[in-house]
């Protein structure tokens, strides 16, 4: 699930993804790609 948060590295996606109720995500194409909680 993509989140429109600009990122350079995956660490920048930690808080935005958690705030969205998901797990830590990866940085893909300059935006955070969050992993849904399973």
Swiss-Prot record:
Expression sites (tissue/organ): Expressed by the venom gland.
Source organism, top-level taxon: Eukaryota
Primary location class: secreted
Entry's Gene Ontology cellular component terms: extracellular region
InterPro entries tied to this protein: Scorpion_toxin-like_sf, Scorpion_toxinS_K_inh
Protein's cellular compartments: Secreted
One Gene Ontology term of the molecular function aspect: toxin activity
Free-text note on domains in this protein's UniProt record: Has the structural arrangement of an alpha-helix connected to antiparallel beta-sheets by disulfide bonds (CS-alpha/beta).
Name of this protein: Toxin BmK NSPK
Organism: Olivierus martensii (Manchurian scorpion)
Lineage, opening ranks: Eukaryota, Metazoa, Ecdysozoa, Arthropoda, Chelicerata
């Amino acid at each position: 699930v993509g989140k429109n948060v600009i990122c350079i590295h995956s660490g920048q996606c930690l808080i935005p993804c958690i705030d969205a109720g998901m797990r830590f995500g990866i940085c893909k194409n300059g935006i955070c790609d969050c992993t849904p909680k399973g």
